[in-house]
């Protein structure tokens, strides 16, 4: 990290923790008696509290979306390319809130937190969560911060699903919804990928039925495999071909099953190794189930247009040409439903070779379109 922060950075940020003691009823039929949500804010809330923007994170995301926690940080927050002075989500204009969702493993109450009833980590006993549960908890955070209505709720992938759910559950509290590289529900193939990832974790002997913390271990192999499978789906065939091709790590083949021979193998193992050291296995299970369960149209006889009839927000939907995890066809399905419901909707399909992860990458056309939409939001 250079001695001075870039001029378009939000600079040093300090996470804050909000404690909630009012029980939160969950879709699974259980409730949490009390819980914490860790969050960060960027920019300044105006006197009318009309410039607040909520950032909803994807599966492995967290509250640290922009800026730096220390001058020694090697990298800024995960969406730093989009949040800051003069960036698409301009902190000179907006007050930005980014949190780690309930069930997460970065400071909000989740499976790795201590269960006050037992004095041990919740582990697998932590209740299964849904996107709507998250939205309810986010609404409580908004209340705490004095935000009656969001100028915009924004998210990519699973974050986009949360943004969509906000317009359904709290239609009066969202003026703009930006759903990026997202979908109105998972396809069978997507559910299948999630199940393979879960089985990698569940069948790891070190998982111990979710109580691995009590045994002083982590299901590292299962987490690595889950991340490796997931990461393949976040990239496109073209981007993998361009980045790795059939390149070898050494000059010759070893003719065995143990060596890391291809560059792509090395990359996947690195991603799995890094992920297994920072992410909680039970949280991974929770996040993938929340993805699987998201299907708001199920409450409206599978009529997606009817699902959004009560929404009052304006919508911006963006997709990427090579995203096969949440393909442009899924975004167009959403756009068609919104138009059928007579909603104000903008749609852009961005030509990008990076696959699903493109929403995290500073692609010029993407940033320009993103910024142009945000500039049109009146406060």
Swiss-Prot record:
Substrate binds at residues 227, 357. Keywords: Acyltransferase, Amino-acid biosynthesis, Cytoplasm, Methionine biosynthesis, Transferase. It is found in: Cytoplasm. InterPro entries: AB_hydrolase_1, AB_hydrolase_fold, HAT_MetX-like. Pathway: Amino-acid biosynthesis; L-methionine biosynthesis via de novo pathway; O-succinyl-L-homoserine from L-homoserine: step 1/1. Belongs to the AB hydrolase superfamily. MetX family. This is Homoserine O-succinyltransferase. The gene is metXS.
């Amino acid at each position: 990290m250079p001695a001075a922060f870039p001029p378009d950075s939000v600079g040093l940020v300090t996470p804050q923790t909000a404690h909630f003691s009012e029980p939160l009823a969950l879709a699974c039929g259980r409730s949490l008696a009390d819980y914490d949500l860790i969050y960060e804010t960027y920019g300044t809330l105006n006197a009318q509290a009309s410039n607040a923007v909520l950032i909803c994170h994807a599966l492995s995301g967290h509250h640290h979306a922009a800026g730096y926690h220390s001058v020694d940080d090697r990298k800024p927050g995960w969406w730093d390319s989009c949040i800051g002075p003069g960036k698409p989500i301009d902190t000179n204009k907006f007050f930005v809130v980014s949190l780690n969702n309930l069930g997460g493993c970065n400071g909000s109450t989740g499976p790795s937190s201590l269960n006050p009833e037992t004095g041990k980590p919740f582990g697998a006993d932590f209740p299964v969560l849904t996107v709507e549960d998250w939205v309810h908890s986010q609404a409580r955070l908004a209340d705490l911060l004095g935000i009656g209505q969001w100028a915009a709720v924004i998210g990519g992938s699973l974050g986009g699903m949360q943004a969509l759910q906000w317009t359904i559950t709290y239609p009066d509290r969202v003026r703009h919804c930006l759903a990026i590289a997202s979908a109105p529900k998972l396809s069978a193939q997507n559910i299948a990928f999630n199940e393979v990832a879960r089985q990698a974790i569940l069948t790891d002997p070190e998982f111990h039925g979710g109580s691995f913390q009590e045994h002083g271990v982590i299901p590292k192999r299962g987490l690595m495999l889950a991340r490796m499978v997931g990461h393949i789906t976040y990239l496109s065939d073209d981007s993998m071909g361009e980045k790795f091709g059939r390149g070898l790590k050494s000059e010759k083949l070893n003719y065995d099953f143990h060596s890391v021979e291809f560059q792509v193998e090395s990359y996947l193992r690195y991603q799995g190794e890094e992920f297994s050291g920072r992410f909680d296995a039970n949280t991974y299970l929770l996040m993938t189930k929340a993805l699987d369960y998201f299907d708001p149209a199920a409450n409206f006889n599978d009529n997606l247009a009817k699902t959004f009839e009560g929404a009052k927000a304006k919508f911006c939907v963006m997709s990427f040409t090579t995203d096969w995890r949440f393909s442009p066809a899924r975004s167009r399905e959403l756009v068609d439903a919104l138009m059928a419901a007579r909603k104000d909707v903008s749609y852009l399909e961005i030509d990008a070779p990076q696959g699903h992860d493109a929403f995290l990458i500073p692609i010029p056309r993407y940033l320009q379109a993103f910024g142009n939409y945000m500039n049109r939001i009146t406060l």
